Swiss-Prot record:
Gene: GONST3
Topology in membrane: Multi-pass membrane protein
Tissue specificity as recorded in UniProt: Expressed in rosette leaves, stems, flowers and siliques.
Described purpose of this protein according to its UniProt entry: GDP-mannose transporter that may be involved in the import of GDP-mannose from the cytoplasm into the Golgi lumen.
GO biological process: nucleotide-sugar transmembrane transport
Transmembrane annotation, as ranges: 33-53, 60-80, 92-112, 125-145, 155-175, 177-197, 209-229, 251-271, 280-300, 303-323
Species whose genome carries this gene: Arabidopsis thaliana
Main subcellular location of this protein, as a coarse class: Golgi
Region of interest (Disordered), residue spans: 331-372
Name the record gives this protein: GDP-mannose transporter GONST3
Keyword annotations from UniProtKB, A to Z: Antiport, Golgi apparatus, Membrane, Sugar transport, Transmembrane, Transmembrane helix, Transport
GO cellular component: Golgi membrane
Disulfide cross-links: none
Family: Belongs to the nucleotide-sugar transporter family. GDP-Mannose:GMP antiporter (GMA) (TC 2.A.7.13) subfamily.
Length: 372
């Protein structure tokens, strides 16, 4: 269709824009199947990761080396997916790597205190103190990042976590000074880690996959230092001289699956955040945490008492309340960017939590084997 411009005497072509066709049942089915498939993949990878890690560490009893291979797989996976145009990440830059180095070092410190805590206490104690981290992170954000004090609803959730922690501590029959000293050290290191990581996310200017790449790559570069400090290098050299069956299928298969599932939980976790609501993602997280507690009760022989387990569940419930109270609902366009920054932070912290969960499974398996 064309019209004449009376002033200029030119003909203006007016194109009829076709209206978007309504969705067919097939397209709706594919979209819903994609959402449920991503959610199922996240639950499957998160719940099976601990079992596969236990299998891998029994066949390859070197937690530092296994964790390093998981770091390598995650970093290589990001680079490969970027080459295939599936994701986008920030390019590697030496100056940015130098700026990110303190965050990687603090992350390693949190893993070290995590390992020492597991050597002196059971998994229940770890879960309780891990659940108490948001209390001190909220205070640290206010004091050092100039964030507003939490709302009344958030304080209520933090108080629930604190109450559950006290209930657990007062009924812990395995209480020792050494265990709770390392628990406090873990609490402090994790608080510093989370607050500093948020500072990095807010100031360093990397997107989600860029943060994942830098975090895993620099953690991998720090691995030789851990190898020397923890004495794992001597053990590996001893095994090499004994010509063990490292290259057999019974070793390569569980180690390979452990690395692949570590990457899968990151991929499905980020995909879930895009495909479902924050509430739905929280529900999936609850299911995975409950499965962790159930597996812990079924596999290990030393647990907290019934009241202690109840306190642990109260802590988890408080954590759910805390997640819900911090979900932001933007009312205007200018609020979109801060919310995106918060999502970037949550995704990186989720990645760190996954790495720590891997360390929990690996260290606890070794501890149980030593008792046997």
């Amino acid at each position: 269709m064309s019209t004449n411009d009376e002033e200029n005497g030119t003909v203006i072509e007016v194109k009829n824009v076709p209206e978007p066709s309504p969705e067919t049942w097939y397209s709706v089915f594919l979209r819903q199947a994609s959402v449920y498939g991503v959610a199922a993949g996240y639950c499957l990878s998160a719940s099976l990761l601990s079992i596969i890690n236990k299998w891998a560490i029994m066949k390859f009893p070197y937690p530092g080396a296994l964790t390093a291979m998981q770091y390598f797989t995650s970093a290589a996976g990001v680079l490969l997916c970027a080459q295939m145009k599936l994701i986008e990440h920030d390019s590697l830059n030496l100056l940015t790597m130098w700026r990110f180095l303190p965050a990687a070092m603090i992350f390693y410190l949190s893993l070290f205190t995590n390992s020492e805590l597991l050597l002196h206490a059971n998994v229940d104690t770890f879960i309780v103190f891990r659940s108490a981290v948001p209390i001190f992170v909220a205070i640290g954000e206010t004091l050092f990042l100039h964030q507003p004090w939490p709302s009344v609803k958030t304080w209520g959730s933090l108080a629930t976590i604190f109450g559950g922690s006290l209930l657990y501590v007062f009924t812990d029959y395995q209480f020792t000074i050494a265990a709770y000293s390392w628990a406090l050290a873990y609490l402090v290191s994790m608080t510093i880690d989370f607050v500093y990581i948020k500072h990095v996310v807010m100031t360093i200017g990397l997107n989600t996959w860029g943060l994942v790449l830098y975090n895993n790559l620099e953690a991998l570069l720090l691995f030789p230092l851990e190898l020397l400090i923890m004495g794992e290098l001597k053990k590996i050299k001893h095994e090499i001289t004994d010509e063990t069956d490292w290259y057999s299928l019974q070793v390569v298969l569980p180690v390979g699956l452990s690395c692949l599932f570590g990457l899968a939980i990151s991929f499905f976790g980020f995909s879930c955040r895009r495909a479902i609501s924050a509430t739905g993602f929280t529900v999936l997280g609850i299911v995975n945490k409950l499965l962790t507690v159930v597996i812990n009760l079924m596999v290990w022989d030393k647990h907290s008492t019934f009241v202690g387990t109840l306190g642990l569940l109260v802590c988890m419930f408080g954590g759910v309340m805390y997640q819900q109270s911090t979900i932001k609902k933007p009312n205007a366009t200018q609020e979109a960017k801060p919310q995106e920054q918060d999502e970037e932070q949550e995704k990186l912290l989720e990645m760190q939590e996954n790495k720590e969960s891997n360390s929990v499974d690996i260290k606890e398996t070794l501890k149980s084997e030593e008792k046997l």
